[in-house]
UniProtKB/Swiss-Prot annotation:
Region (Complementarity-determining-3): 115-121
Protein name: Immunoglobulin kappa variable 2D-40
Disulfide bond annotation, renumbered to this chain: 43-114
One of the GO BP terms on file: immune response
Length: 121
């Protein structure tokens, strides 16, 4: 059985006072998946999300399941939110990031978002 998963392809965030907006780009735009198989989603930022003051990379991943609000999966690059199964992992550095699902389950279907947290409007 194959399950459809929808991904948000482009997020643009306006940052006042910034010389240019931070643009977040996700690939692929959609991803057919098979239960039990691995899957990964890539995210690229137009600017580094590494905070030189504290060494943290402010990139989060969210999953919005059908009919529900988005739920936090991964925060600050690689930390799983409470209750998130360990089949989810986040990695990357600077401007290139990956969300990996080691073994896809039916409940993983939804819209996945990457979000930068280094600058806010």
């Amino acid at each position: 059985m194959r399950l459809p998963a929808q991904l948000l392809g482009l997020l643009m965030l306006w940052v006042p006072g910034s010389s240019e907006d931070i643009v977040m780009t996700q690939t692929p735009l959609s991803l057919p998946v098979t239960p039990g198989e691995p899957a990964s989603i890539s995210c690229r930022s137009s600017q580094s999300l590494l905070d030189s003051d504290d060494g943290n990379t402010y990139l989060d991943w969210y999953l919005q399941k059908p009919g529900q609000s988005p739920q936090l999966l991964i925060y600050t690059l690689s930390y799983r939110a409470s209750g998130v199964p360990d089949r989810f992992s986040g990695s990357g550095s600077g401007t290139d990031f990956t969300l990996k699902i080691s073994r896809v389950e039916a409940e993983d279907v939804g819209v996945y978002y990457c979000m930068q947290r280094i600058e806010f409007p």
